[in-house]
């Protein structure tokens, strides 16, 4: 059954056509991933579906009585409203009914109504009708459902009466998702729902999407999430004449990538064959016209016209874009570096009573790729910044020799990518940002920025005015110019579209140095890292292998009972490291 019908809609902004004549039908129960490059119009289409924006032409028709819930990229809610009240506000219809029920009950106690049997019967009948309506809409269970959803989202009861403004970005996102679910929608629209979520919450999000009875449309750069939840990919891609067009692909994201590649190769073959046929027809037309001019033969003129009509009647095949323009990213270390890159020798770190790490020990060899994972607030970025030297280990570290607790190889040059773009001076232009790293002429800086898809106009603006994706690309361009042989990356795929994330994966795969990366992007971690460091409850656990192997090991551990942390590989002479170890000192 159709839940939403998009009929030939068009949208333009600032003189730029976003899409025109776009049509799409969404069926009940479909789980759809909406993909496409940044800036193509995905969020605009989602807001149009939600009724928050109106198309310039065409219409969006929803099934009669269908309810739609929309979760934006950044969900703030009412800053001063209590968390539980923020959820309950999703059902304004029930709140209105509660007010009407209360008003009817108040009228029953009025002397004039109590003295008039007919009036009292009318009020009682209205009260009964309102109660039935309230029950039919799930009113009596509303508070219980809201509380249950908050528990499912991992929000403790002591936070339910706190104002929204005190929550973290990830917690606000979960409240927004819970509010959407409480609204009992038939169509759920999610714009980057995994932003700010840690691994555990991403797994919860997957379970919620899979269990949801209605239709779901998700915008996400998380390929793992799209693989696990959707059965249809809706791709918005640039079109030559109409802004953007929508293509539908059956299956999850990985299936879409394979189908897309095969379809482009087939289109290329068909295009070449058609161009060959057109060339042959055009050559024949030229011959017939030449003969007609020599012998003045009407038959040759007719043959030329017939050949031209053949060409005109053809459904022209567009020349496929086999490789869309992508950022040009390559990391070339200036020097190779020694055998050992980083050594953690019993690192302690706490903020007040909150213990981040206690006697953390691990060795990272040159050329290794290490992924740091853990719940939000566990201390992943803290560990990265201690390695970088921006934070100092506590004085108790390394038996009181805190200054030696983190050893960096003498030939190791660190390069840092900051999650919040702190490496960038927001007052400077991208051109200045590149020239700060390496002396170069302005034209060379503009050319390098162009290879990172930063247009000339944006290259001359203060970085503060750039989009999140543009800031990320400027940061990557700067990092590339450093020539560092050990890259410390804090959530590098945030704000990158899938194409740019794939380029980053390829660049890191070819990089000859060491990589230490904090990320919640499971697909990215599986492609890039060969060891996992998990920060959990003040401990540092080491897992040999990529993210999928780590997730499998953790699942096994959690099924029976939590294992006792083991000693680090280096503490037991001659022993091979266990797949899962706690890097705890003796």
Which role does the model predict for each range below?
Residues 260-288, 297-300, 304-314, 318:
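Intracellular alpha-helical coupling/juxtamembrane segments of multi-pass membrane proteins
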Residues 104, 111, 137, 144, ...:
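Hydrophobic stripe of amphipathic alpha-helices that form coiled-coil interfaces
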């Amino acid at each position: 059954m159709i839940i939403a019908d998009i009929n030939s809609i068009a949208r333009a902004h600032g003189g730029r056509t976003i899409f025109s004549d776009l049509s799409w039908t969404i069926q009940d129960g479909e789980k759809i991933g909406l993909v496409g490059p940044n800036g193509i119009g995905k969020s605009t289409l989602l807001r149009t579906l939600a009724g928050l924006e109106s198309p310039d032409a065409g219409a969006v028709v929803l099934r009669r009585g269908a309810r739609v819930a929309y979760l934006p990229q950044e969900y703030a809610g009412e800053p001063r409203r209590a968390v539980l009240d923020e959820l309950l506000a999703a059902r304004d219809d029930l709140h209105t009914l509660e007010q009407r029920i209360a008003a009817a009950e108040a009228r029953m106690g009025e002397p004039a109504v109590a003295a008039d049997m007919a009036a009292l019967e009318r009020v009682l009948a209205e009260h009964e009708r309102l109660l039935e309506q309230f029950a039919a809409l799930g009113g009596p269970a509303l508070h219980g459902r809201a509380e249950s959803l908050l528990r499912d989202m991992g929000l403790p009861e002591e936070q339910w009466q706190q104002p929204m403004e005190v929550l973290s970005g990830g917690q606000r996102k979960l409240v927004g998702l819970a509010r959407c679910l409480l609204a009992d929608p038939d169509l759920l629209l999610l714009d980057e729902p995994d932003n700010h979520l840690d691994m555990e919450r991403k797994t919860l999000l997957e379970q919620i999407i899979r269990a949801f009875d209605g239709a779901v449309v998700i915008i996400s750069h998380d390929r793992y999430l799209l693989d696990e939840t959707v059965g249809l990919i809706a791709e918005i891609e640039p079109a030559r004449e109409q802004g953007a067009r929508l293509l539908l692909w059956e299956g999850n994201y990985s299936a879409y990538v394979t189908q897309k590649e095969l379809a482009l190769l087939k289109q290329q073959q068909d295009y070449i064959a058609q161009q060959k046929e057109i060339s042959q027809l055009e050559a024949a037309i030229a011959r017939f016209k030449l003969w007609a001019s020599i012998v003045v033969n009407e038959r040759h003129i007719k043959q030329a016209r017939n050949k031209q009509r053949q060409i005109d009647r053809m459904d022209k095949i567009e020349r496929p874009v086999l490789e869309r323009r992508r950022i040009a990213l390559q990391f070339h270390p200036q020097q190779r570096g020694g055998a050992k890159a980083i050594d953690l020798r019993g690192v302690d770190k706490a903020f007040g009573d909150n213990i981040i790490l206690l006697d953390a020990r691990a060795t990272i060899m040159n050329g290794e790729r290490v992924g740091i994972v853990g719940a939000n607030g566990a201390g992943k970025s803290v560990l990265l910044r201690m390695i970088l030297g921006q934070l100092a280990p506590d004085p108790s570290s390394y038996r009181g020799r805190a200054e030696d607790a983190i050893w960096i190889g003498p030939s190791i040059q660190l390069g840092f990518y900051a999650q919040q773009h702190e490496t960038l001076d927001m007052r400077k232009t991208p051109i200045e940002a590149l020239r700060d790293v390496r002396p170069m002429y302005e034209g060379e800086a503009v050319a390098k920025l162009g290879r990172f898809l930063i247009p000339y106009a944006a290259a001359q603006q203060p970085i503060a005015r750039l989009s999140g994706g543009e800031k990320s690309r400027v940061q990557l361009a700067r990092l590339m110019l450093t020539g560092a042989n050990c890259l410390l990356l804090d959530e590098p795929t945030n704000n990158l579209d899938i194409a740019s994330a794939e380029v980053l994966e390829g660049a890191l795969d070819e990089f000859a140095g060491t990589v230490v990366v904090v990320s919640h992007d499971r697909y990215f971690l599986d492609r890039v890292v060969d060891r996992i460091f998990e920060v959990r409850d003040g401990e540092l656990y080491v897992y040999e292998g990529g993210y999928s192997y780590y997730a499998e090991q953790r699942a096994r551990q959690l099924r029976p009972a939590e294992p006792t942390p083991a000693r680090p590989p280096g503490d037991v002479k001659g022993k091979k490291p266990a797949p899962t170890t706690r890097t705890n000192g003796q």
